[in-house]
Design a protein with these regions (language model features):
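Conserved hydrophobic "DFG−1" position in protein kinase catalytic cores
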Residues: 36, 45, 112-113, 135
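The catalytic Nudix box helix
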Residues: 61-96, 111, 126-129, 137
Length: 169
């Protein structure tokens, strides 16, 4: 039987003995990851302050925790864009859902956002957390990931799916 050994604001950890082995599981919140594309065909990323990380800032896609009490996955994606970059999209395309299960468990919905129009909502994390909005050409962004100029994370898997998707169009 799975038993909870830790529950924080973001992370939950359980243990379960199966066939004499103690298996640990980490549950992370599900989320949305958005790749907004501007009128020049560039992908917008944010430079974000992260005081608990080393280094204390990072470049990443627009993203957030999926809060189903605040709407659908797509509505959450729109809200995250409004909070983090001050735009909403006329067209949202969910191009991938990544479901992780095993030791680390969560789900991420990945979106392409096009037809961006200004629409700012207050950022609940504080406006000062977003240091800048950066625009990258597809190949430039790919090179930055491959050269480790942008740190890899779960969202990097989504970028390479995006890359494959856009190259097929």
């Amino acid at each position: 039987m799975e038993r909870e050994v830790y529950k924080g604001q973001i992370v939950r950890v359980t243990e379960e003995i199966i066939e004499g082995i103690n298996w640990e599981r980490v549950y992370l919140p599900s989320g949305v990851i958005i790749f907004p594309i501007n009128e020049k065909g560039q992908i917008l990323m944010i430079e974000e302050k992260r005081p608990h990380e080393n280094p204390p800032q990072r470049i990443k896609p627009v993203s957030g925790i999926l809060e189903l009490d605040k709407g659908t996955s797509e509505e959450n994606a729109q809200r995250e864009m409004q909070e983090e970059i001050g735009f909403k999209a006329n067209h949202m395309e969910k191009f991938w859902t990544m479901k992780a299960s095993g030791t680390v468990n969560n789900q991420q919905d990945f979106y392409i956002a096009r037809g961006l129009i200004p629409s700012k909502l207050p950022n609940p994390d504080g406006e000062e957390t977003i240091l800048s909005i950066r625009a990258f050409d597809l190949e430039e962004l790919r090179e930055k990931f491959l050269n480790d100029e942008i740190r890899w994370s779960m969202s990097t898997l989504g970028f390479f799916r995006l890359y494959q998707h856009l190259k097929a169009i």
